[in-house]
């Protein structure tokens, strides 16, 4: 039973990788910023983005009110989960040419917090 779950997870990961590769190929044809939502965790979104020059990156966006950058404990947990997911799929995505120099970007409505 444990082995079945591991195999299922591997299949699921490769399916995500293939989906992202196809989406990147489509997005590059447009020549503009394109964003694909991978996971929504509370107010935090984990996205794959393709830039106008065709490179890709993982982007964590925190939807915050305009009144500042003060996070609740729940929001910090959501951010932590998003970072963990991003780090876990980053190594998988680095085999895609557009992700050669992949970095995880953490942004809010006010701007970049960390890269």
Curated annotation (Swiss-Prot):
Protein name stated in the entry: Uncharacterized protein ORF115
Organism per entry: Acidianus filamentous virus 1 (isolate United States/Yellowstone)
């Amino acid at each position: 039973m444990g082995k079945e779950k591991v195999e299922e997870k591997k299949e699921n990961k490769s399916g995500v990788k293939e989906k992202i590769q196809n989406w990147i190929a489509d997005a590059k044809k447009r020549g503009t910023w394109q964003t694909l939502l991978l996971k929504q965790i509370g107010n935090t979104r984990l996205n794959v983005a393709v830039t106008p020059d065709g490179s890709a990156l993982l982007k964590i966006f925190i939807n915050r009110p305009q009144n500042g950058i003060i996070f609740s404990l729940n929001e910090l947990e959501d951010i932590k989960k998003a970072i963990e997911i991003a780090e876990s799929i980053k190594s998988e995505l680095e085999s895609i040419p557009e992700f050669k120099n992949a970095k995880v970007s953490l942004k809010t409505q006010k701007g970049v917090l960390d890269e």
